[in-house]
A protein has these predicted regions:
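Interfacial helix-cap and linker-helix signal at transmembrane-aqueous boundaries
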Residues: 46-47, 78-79, 163-171, 225, ...
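Glycine/proline-centered helix-kink
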Residues: 127, 148, 154-165, 218, ...
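Cytosolic juxtamembrane N-terminal segment immediately preceding the first transmembrane helix
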Residues: 1-34, 48
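12-transmembrane solute porter fold
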Residues: 19-34, 39-41, 54, 60-61, ...
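Structural signature of transmembrane alpha-helices in multi-pass secondary transporters
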Residues: 32, 61-64, 68, 95, ...
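Central cavity-lining transmembrane alpha-helices of secondary-active solute carriers
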Residues: 62-76, 126, 130, 315-327
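Helix-loop-helix hairpins in multi-pass membrane proteins, especially solute transporters
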Residues: 75-209
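Hydrophobic transmembrane-helix bundles of small-molecule transporters
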Residues: 170-280, 313, 451
């Protein structure tokens, strides 16, 4: 009898820990996404403290993103080789240590090195966390688990401008990074308690040649995207960077096809739902990821709001992200994946298009409402795409699928910010030859461009079968 009671206690404890896993993993994504945006509002004070030109601090942003993209592909291999629990805890530790170094930085060089360390931790933290959920939950529960992760993770970019402005204004820019320390320590503690070890019994040797080819391609293409709007960079250097990137990735593609165990396998693309979800998400994420970047600029540069007030106006975006969690499962059951992924991008496009009609006299309540509605539909889109990624993926391919999806998501983030910056630069030329500020015309034209990009993603999602994801929804 005592043995039976003990087993029931253990079973109840296990279910409780399993229930908390999505929230634990979500905070890893939250920290990574937060660090991608929170630094932007702190750049002027950082430049003053470090005695450098504010434009030089762009390296602190791009070094973090490049580090993320470069080391993401090896996260799946390390998780299979050493175990998901060990890698997830190590990733949080590295990320937290990098955050400490960022907060203690006294020079631009030290800050860049610290940001690279941060990126290495973040690169392994999110794909491994997502893999933990995919391996822990059955299809029926995976929809809800990944939905929770998507919602919490996307709060980072939404709250980044507000948090960065508040910390910089009332404390100092160092706290933009030091705030990660208590979150990281708690994450390590609960990861030890809640995560069960999971690794693949037989793991092939590490693909060094593939890592070099794939990494070189990603780094050079990301350099091209990050520096394309910088007039100080020669056109020749940009052309060479793009050419090296394309050649490296094409070479890797043919190399991987002929290798039994490549570092990153494109075999998940043979699964129709994964292919459509990832390629479609690349388009829609360009628009969605650009909003936390372009909206603070519009509100501060053209509407004259302070960094803190503009952050408050964008705060409803984060509330919209959270609110979607309570309706996503019902929407998926009622409409199915295909209908949602065809209708939702059009709604996103209409909202973004409406931003093009805003002006300095627009009501702050209208701005807040649009931000809330944008967050709501964007969260529905993220949750739907993320769960669809893995619904039909076989167990042996889940590690590769997780890494591949993460790389595409990071590329989409870079594309969103870079294309938005290029659009603002392009449409600003006729009206602002001195480049002292960005014209309202440039913002409005950029919103129209982003709306068209969002709507075009329906071309990809239309390839989904009507029955896509139906089995998982019927068992939820």
């Amino acid at each position: 009898m005592q043995e039976g009671i003990r087993m029931r206690v253990i079973s109840t404890s296990h279910r409780s820990h399993k229930t908390m896993l999505p929230w634990l993993v979500s905070f890893g994504l939250f920290m990574e996404n937060l660090d991608s945006t929170v630094i932007n509002t702190a750049i002027p004070q950082m430049a003053h403290t470090l005695a450098v030109n504010p434009l030089s601090l762009k390296l602190a942003v791009t070094s973090y993103l490049l580090s993320l993209v470069l080391f993401m592909p090896i996260s799946g291999y390390l998780a299979d080789k050493l175990g998901t629990k060990r890698i997830f805890i190590s990733a949080i530790t590295v990320f937290t240590f990098g955050s400490l170094l960022c907060g203690l930085s006294t020079s631009l060089t030290m800050l860049i090195i610290a940001r690279i360390i941060q990126g290495i931790g973040g690169a392994m933290m999110v794909p491994t966390g997502r893999l933990i959920l995919v391996k822990t939950f059955e299809k029926s529960a995976m929809v809800n688990a990944l939905s929770n992760m998507a919602v919490i993770g996307q709060i980072g970019p939404a709250f980044g401008p507000l948090l960065g402005g508040a910390l910089t204004s009332y404390l100092s820019w160092h706290w933009v990074f030091l705030i990660n320390l208590p979150i990281g320590v708690l994450g390590i503690f609960f990861a030890y308690r809640w995560i069960d070890e999971n690794h693949t019994a037989q793991t092939p040797s590490f693909d060094i040649k593939g890592f070099i080819l794939f990494g070189l391609g990603l780094v050079t293409i990301n350099l091209f995207l990050s520096l394309a709007d910088n007039r100080l960079i020669s056109l020749k250097l940009l052309e060479v960077s793009l050419a090296i990137g394309i050649i490296s990735l094409v070479t890797y593609y043919f190399y991987a096809k002929n290798k039994t165990y490549p570092m990153i396998s494109f075999s998940p693309f043979k699964t129709h739902t994964f292919k459509v979800a990832v390629l479609g998400s690349l388009w829609i994420r360009i628009t969605v990821n650009s909003l936390p970047f372009i909206l603070p600029l519009l509100l501060q540069i053209n509407f004259g709001y302070s960094a803190f007030i503009s952050g408050l106006l964008i705060l409803p975006y984060g509330l919209g992200l959270i609110s979607a969690k309570f309706i996503i499962k019902s929407l998926l059951r009622y409409l199915g994946y295909r209908r949602i992924l065809l209708i939702n991008p059009c709604i996103i496009a209409l909202i973004v298009l409406y931003f093009a009609y805003l002006n300095p006299m627009s009501s702050i309540f209208l701005i807040a409402f649009l931000c809330f509605f944008a967050g709501l539909v964007c969260s529905i889109q993220f949750s739907s795409m993320q769960t669809l990624n893995y619904i039909d993926i076989q167990d042996q391919e889940k590690s590769q699928a997780s890494s591949l999806a993460s790389v595409f998501q990071q590329l989409a983030m870079n594309l969103g910010v870079c294309l938005t910056a290029l659009s603002l630069e392009f449409f600003n030329v006729p009206l602002q030859p001195q480049k002292t500020l960005i014209s309202l015309h440039a913002f409005h034209s950029s919103f129209v461009f982003l709306a068209l990009v969002a709507a075009s993603s329906t071309i990809v999602f239309q390839m989904l079968k009507k029955t896509a994801g139906l089995n998982a929804l019927q068992t939820t």
